[in-house]
Structure formats: structure tokens, C-alpha cells
């Protein structure tokens, strides 16, 4: 599969994970008090910075034609993992109420 097709596939999957992540973040945020909302926002910003640095590292390491597919895969995988983490957390908070 050409790199451009790999990137397009990863981007489509990441769009799905972005949707799950955003919905889970919204659900979790609605269930928290103001102090916890601020901490959630700080955590999410730190996660985004970490995700970006991790994926930039792969980009720098692979370089050439493999760099862009690798960064697309990295962003997709990281977004999926964070989406599942937030969804699990939101589900747990909902069960406790």
C-alpha cells in the first residue's frame, strides 16, 4: 500500500477515535466539579503535548517516506488509547453517581 493510502486510512481511523475521545471528555467533564474540571483540562493538555512529542520523535527517527505514515499511525494509536481511557473513566464516574 502506498504511503499516501496508509496515511489516509490512519486519518480516517483517527477521526473515529477523535469522536469517541471528544464525547468521553464531554461526559466526564459534565460529571466533575469545577476543581476537577480544571484538573481534567490540565491532564488532557499534558497528554496532547506528550502525544505530540512522542510522535515527533518517531517522525525524526524514521525520516524519509516512512516518516509520515509512522506519525499518522502514532497519532491514531495514541488518540485511540486516550479515548478508551477517558471513556472508561467517564463510565466509572457515571456508575458511582
Regions found by a protein language model. Give the residues of each.
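N-terminal alpha-helical modules
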Residues: 1-97
Amino acid at each position: 500500500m502506498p504511503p499516501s493510502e496508509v496515511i489516509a486510512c490512519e486519518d480516517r481511523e483517527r477521526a473515529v477515535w477523535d469522536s469517541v475521545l471528544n464525547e468521553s471528555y464531554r461526559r466526564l467533564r459534565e460529571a466533575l466539579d469545577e476543581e476537577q474540571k480544571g484538573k481534567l483540562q490540565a491532564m488532557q493538555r499534558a497528554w496532547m503535548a506528550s502525544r505530540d512529542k512522542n510522535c515527533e520523535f518517531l517522525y525524526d527517527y524514521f525520516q524519509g517516506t516512512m516518516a509520515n505514515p509512522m506519525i499518522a499511525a502514532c497519532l491514531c494509536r495514541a488518540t485511540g488509547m486516550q479515548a478508551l481511557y477517558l471513556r472508561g473513566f467517564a463510565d466509572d464516574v457515571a456508575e458511582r453517581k
